Amino acid sequence: MKQKLIKKAQELRQHGFTTGEIADELNVSMDTARWLTLQKPAEEKPEAPVDFFINWKSLGGNSTRLRYVSGALSDMALSHGEAEVILGIAVSGIPFATMMADFLEDMSGVETSLAVYHPHKHRKEKDDGEGAISTNFGSVEGKKVVIVDDVITSGKTVKEVIHAVKDHGGEPIAVTVLIDKSGLSEIEEVPIESLIKVGRL
């Protein structure tokens, strides 16, 4: 399994993916993605960072399954109030957020917009720019916002998004994720809801 991950990470790097994009694609932390891309087959390898590879392709490749999971995430989000904006973290949070906006509008009767956030980790490593809320989707200004992603590993990206939402005048009321590898119950006083929590014994 490890050799397959190393090969996949290196193939993604050759196709121009940044470390952040590789981390998202393989559902591993940035440290693990960096380690995977630096491996050389014939040399002695440093010890790998502790992480878990999450493969949810059987879910991500099926719209019916995505809809069911998005319904469950929507139900969890409702326990924190009525959201006016569902913000998906690019890339893998967007499909969930899109379906959740539809579900939550039907469930709560409150008009619910979709917003998209492009995190800093998707930028080229040499770029010191910040992540950004896309202007092609809904605005978070003056709105109650639920943040959505597929996997939370360290919480760094979610913390970045929470700050961006607040900086744009929004109020983050919850973070919903498919899989939580962080073990955190909240970030910046915003509760985290997950369908699955992963931890080491």
From Swiss-Prot:
Pfam families: Pribosyltran. One of its GO terms (molecular function) is DNA binding. GO terms for cellular component: cytoplasm. It comes from the Archaea. Keywords: DNA-binding, Transcription, Transcription regulation. Gene3D superfamilies: 3.40.50.2020. One of its GO terms (biological process) is 'de novo' pyrimidine nucleobase biosynthetic process. InterPro entries: GfcR-like, PRibTrfase_dom, PRTase-like. PANTHER family: OROTATE PHOSPHORIBOSYLTRANSFERASE 1-RELATED. Contains an N-terminal DNA-binding winged helix-turn-helix domain and a C-terminal regulatory domain (or effector binding domain) resembling phosphoribosyltransferase (PRT) domain. Belongs to the purine/pyrimidine phosphoribosyltransferase family. GfcR subfamily. HAMAP family: GfcR. This is Transcriptional regulator GfcR. The gene is gfcR.
